[in-house]
Amino acid sequence: MQDTVTTSALLDPSHSSVSTQDNSSTGGHTSSTSPQLSKPSITPVPAKSRNPHPRANIRRMRRIIAEDPEWSLAIVPLLTELCIQHIIRNFQKNPILKQMLPEHQQKVLNHLSPDLPLAVTANLIDSENYWLRCCMHRWPVCHVAHHGGSWKRMFFERHLENLLKHFIPGTTDPAVILDLLPLCRNYVRRVHVDQFLPPVQLPAQLRPGDQSDSGSEGEMEEPTVDHYQLGDLVAGLSHLEELDLVYDVKDCGMNFEWNLFLFTYRDCLSLAAAIKACHTLKIFKLTRSKVDDDKARIIIRSLLDHPVLEELDLSQNLIGDRGARGAAKLLSHSRLRVLNLANNQVRAPGAQSLAHALAHNTNLISLNLRLNCIEDEGGQALAHALQTNKCLTTLHLGGNELSEPTATLLSQVLAINTTLTSINLSCNHIGLDGGKQLLEGMSDNKTLLEFDLRLSDVAQESEYLIGQALYANREAARQRALNPSHFMSTITANGPENSVG
């Protein structure tokens, strides 16, 4: 009995005092008249288990714990999930995607790394969400609208442009670009390169006999500065529609030299051959590249009778009257709709050549001669051409030393022309009388929507009244756009003689 009490006390101290008190009162013997008092001293208290029975933990037995949204019962992953994870980890070695169900394909694409080799992903993955992640991973600013709204097209166009901008002739392996062409040829439609690096010029080592007796240097051969030749690139892009080039060097710092910015004769010949062979090219831009008359004529000659060319931009170069005559010939031998020769060296003879071609042209809708020096002689020639031209809608003659004689002829154009919607004569010397002449012409015009006369010495009153006439024309155009059927019925009812005014 003593052993029983001792064991009970070790197991549960709360019962030790009761057992000792009972033993002392009975003198070590159990009383038969009080069995209820002696029962705790006989029956040991069960010990607390360190690993209680699962039923003791109600929370553990619950399969759903509503108050803990992050809790979940540990289960074995589905076999499909294990397979998807394995495919993602080994996609570069075994790129299976087309054989999977659509919902499984989406799971794989959502977890693929954007750093996978293009040889694996280019012609296999068409998901725009995947290419969106690739673009955002490489470039913090992405304007997908400039690339037709396609993230895949944007990725390949910008990736190719980045390679071209950092290509160093004689140093960079051409295979870097040529190997990419089969992967991107179906997606690249626009190439915009604003930098072409020249070859690295190493210091020439003088050989014995290269110096004269006086110690002066002998005659040294001028190093070549030709840039990357675009022939193979353009030929490899079967859907190329726009080519925008600037032969310039950025961030040259202390390594500045004038020959870094040369558009060489060989560059010109190579580029001319490339664009002549590209029968899908619709827009060609070559700006800020010091293109003179000779190089411009080479470029323009390669574009004669081009089947689909619609826009030519040679702005901000060194093109003079000879280059303008070449552009005038192009107007007669192409389907060109936009011609931009802004900020060049075109004078009156060049403008007269363009005017002669414009008088018989039926395709051109926009002509930009801003920041040249055609003066009144060239301006009047263009005004005469516009009296017969029925297709031009936009004319920019800002900053061309124009004055009142040109304004007088343009007022006659405004009275009879029904296609022009935008004219810019800013930064000229139109004068007070010229402004009045233009106002008189605007009184009979119902189609012009924009007329820029800033910094042209026009009286404030004339400028205000011209603005009122433009507002009326824009309001009428808006009404026609909102209800074209009503406008046509009105013309039919009133007859053609009453349709204006």
Swiss-Prot record:
Region Disordered, residue ranges: 1-56, 202-222
Keyword S-adenosyl-L-methionine: no
Coiled-coil features, chain-numbered ranges: none
GO biological process: flagellated sperm motility; microtubule-based movement
UniProt keyword Cytoplasm present: yes
Composition bias, Low complexity: 24-34
Biased composition (Polar residues): 1-23
Family assignment from sequence similarity: Belongs to the DRC5 family.
Quaternary structure annotation from Swiss-Prot or TrEMBL: Component of the nexin-dynein regulatory complex (N-DRC). Interacts with DRC1. Interacts with FBXL13/DRC6, DRC3 and DRC7.
The protein's name: Dynein regulatory complex subunit 5
Organism classification: Eukaryota, Metazoa, Chordata, Craniata, Vertebrata
